């Protein structure tokens, strides 16, 4: 007889019903528990009543498809400024200004990137210097040191004050620098002005001798224009000199004196020599005189006219020199027009020497 037959035969009907009830209750409990979990999750997530929404509430969120209004039923105004809320400072900003505001607010603009690049470069330089100190074995390697040597040479050429870039002649806004300016003054940047705090007394004196020197209230830089600067007055220049130099400011030359000295030219004897040559050429033959007159007129027309000094006058000694020069040129006039022209050119090119005591001549007895 089998085991199953024995177990079933030994059970009565009450026990069988109890077992069937237990199995059924387990199945119902599993089914109900799953449904309860699903309903609970739907309620917590907010989609339990999604299919059974009220029709009146649905009308509030209905998409509007009409001309002249947007999807929400509002009248569209194209002139109204669109506003955006900054996620960092929570300010409402116009849409056209939102991007630059966000760059500045978050620190992601151009200036911030430059600052970040400088920080990265400085950190790289510090780490590179530390690595160079640690790795001294590769100093003599040409492949590794070529770039650094090139950079070092470039830095030396930039620091060299005698480089051709620094030796270029600088100009004022109102004219060129005069020849009496100290060459050490070229090391300052004339486009941005000169800082008087870094200059010594001698440098200040040399600068204030030739330049305006009035200190700007905003930039704290000295004006590098001439002493006839139209932007500043004489009182301002005088006050700056007293402030910077103290009592020694009175020893500086005045602007009028500087201009008179620059405008003064010593009397040139070339004009006298050309006149002597003109007087002597009148004693030569007509053909020679015509050619010499034509050449002289051409040269005088090409040469710019000079202003005769009002105090120029010939003394008796000067008259004697003039007569001697006339006799000498008249005696040599018979040699021909070629020698005459050569003599005229040489007399024009040579500058007159210093005045020497006149030699005794036949005119002394007449006087």
UniProtKB/Swiss-Prot annotation:
Source organism, top-level taxon: Eukaryota
Coiled coil: none
Chief location category: nucleus
Residue numbers spanned by region Disordered: 116-184, 280-367
Cellular location(s): Nucleus
Transmembrane segments: none
One example GO MF annotation: transcription coactivator activity
Protein family membership: Belongs to the SGF11 family.
Function, as annotated: Component of the transcription regulatory histone acetylation (HAT) complex SAGA, a multiprotein complex that activates transcription by remodeling chromatin and mediating histone acetylation and deubiquitination. Within the SAGA complex, participates in a subcomplex that specifically deubiquitinates histone H2B. The SAGA complex is recruited to specific gene promoters by activators, where it is required for transcription.
Assembly, per entry: Component of some SAGA transcription coactivator-HAT complexes. Within the SAGA complex, participates in a subcomplex of SAGA called the DUB module (deubiquitination module).
Name under which the protein is recorded: Ataxin-7-like protein 3
The species this protein was found in: Danio rerio (Zebrafish)
Underlying gene: atxn7l3
